[in-house]
């Protein structure tokens, strides 16, 4: 696929449970009335058949926005048993949900089950996870503590994946003569992606990650400069980090079809205010339009050094955009 990597975020959640008008982001992303396991499965099959590089699963229990959600690890394991070559990843794991020794064991097991196809995406649990944690009885902590916990989580996992007997004495986690067997098939371990924007998270990226993931197109160029600075300060080559971007795509064959589709989404969002203003806000956040327009928008990210994209297609549960993007967008990049 032209030397670039394209993955698909799987639709493992149901519709928004928010009554009345939804946010324009939700209106763009989710246009279906229930969680559909068949749609999840067929998305994975089509992605593999069209040579997409990867499929990705978010890590949530449930939220105030959506009660219907599939759990991350059991979903990835299910999909590993159904597919053969496509890579399977988490985007992103929350360090508050699982002890890292358990996480390391789960990851090693799934890497073996999938014949070395596991991708591990980590984050530090953004603020909207707070309500989810409170509902589930998971203690919520501030951002600095979450970042420290993420750092220790990655350190513990790497120790267990590399050492015969691991010992660790951290602020939050510890190991005493611990072991994890079998080791992951991928050496030294499954690729680690860390998602984040802030200065402290980008420092962690520079120190521990194989890849950085930005969660949208806003402020990307400025944040890249911060990441470069962190890499320089620790003596790491910036180019050794793969740059990945999560994007949402709304794709139609013609401009007329695209505008008709966006007007339907505008109405689904409540239809308040001016459509052109609403569309302008949406187009700041999304890669959208005709195939030619999407190619042009993606080119700007290639110029910034991005080589991998995790796509949330906006036409779900329809699967039409997946082959259209593969045939009319990717070959022109």
List where the protein language model places each region.
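Alpha-helix-loop-beta-strand connector modules within alpha/beta enzyme cores
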Residues: 67-90, 149-156, 323-333
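Short, acidic/polar
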Residues: 35-47, 103-106, 194-207, 290-300
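Conserved, mostly hydrophobic/aromatic
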Residues: 51, 59, 79, 110, ...
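Flexible, glycine-rich active-site loops centered on histidine and acidic residues
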Residues: 4-35, 95-167, 212, 219, ...
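N-terminal small/glycine-rich loop or linker at the start of catalytic domains
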Residues: 1-30, 128-132, 171-189, 255-284
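Hydrophobic faces of well-ordered beta-strands that scaffold small-molecule active sites
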Residues: 6-10, 55-57, 87-90, 118-122, ...
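N-terminal beta1-alpha1-beta2 module of alpha/beta enzyme domains
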Residues: 1-82, 188-190, 312
């Amino acid at each position: 696929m032209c030397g670039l990597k394209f993955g698909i975020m799987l639709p493992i959640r149901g519709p928004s449970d928010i009554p009345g008008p939804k946010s324009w982001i939700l209106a763009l992303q989710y246009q279906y009335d229930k969680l559909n396991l068949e749609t999840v499965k067929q998305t994975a099959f089509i992605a593999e058949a069209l040579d997409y590089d990867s499929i990705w699963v978010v890590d949530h229990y449930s939220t105030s926005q959506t009660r219907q959600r599939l759990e991350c690890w059991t979903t990835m394991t299910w999909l590993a048993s159904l597919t053969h070559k496509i890579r399977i990843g988490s985007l992103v794991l929350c360090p508050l949900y699982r002890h890292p020794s358990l996480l390391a064991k789960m990851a090693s097991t799934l890497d073996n089950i999938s014949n070395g196809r596991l991708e591990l995406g980590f984050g530090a649990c953004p603020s909207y996870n707070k309500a989810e944690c409170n509902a589930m009885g998971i203690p919520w902590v501030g951002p600095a503590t979450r970042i420290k916990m993420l750092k220790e989580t990655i350190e513990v996992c790497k120790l267990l994946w590399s050492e015969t007997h691991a010992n660790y004495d951290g602020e939050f986690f510890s190991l005493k003569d611990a072991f994890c067997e079998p080791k992951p098939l991928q050496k030294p371990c499954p690729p680690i992606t860390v998602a984040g924007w802030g200065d402290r998270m980008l420092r962690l990226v520079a120190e521990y990650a194989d890849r950085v993931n930005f969660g949208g197109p806003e402020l990307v160029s400025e944040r890249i400069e911060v990441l470069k600075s962190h890499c320089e300060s620790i003596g790491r080559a910036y180019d050794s980090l793969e740059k990945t971007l999560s994007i949402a795509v709304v794709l139609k064959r013609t401009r007329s079809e695209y505008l008709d589709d966006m007007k339907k989404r505008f109405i689904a969002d409540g239809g308040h205010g001016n459509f052109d203003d609403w569309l302008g806000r949406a187009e700041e956040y999304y890669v959208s339009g005709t195939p030619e327009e999407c190619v042009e928008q993606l080119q700007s990210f290639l110029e910034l050094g991005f080589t991998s994209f995790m796509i949330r297609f906006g036409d779900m549960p329809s699967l039409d955009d997946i082959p259209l993007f593969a045939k009319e967008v990717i070959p022109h990049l």
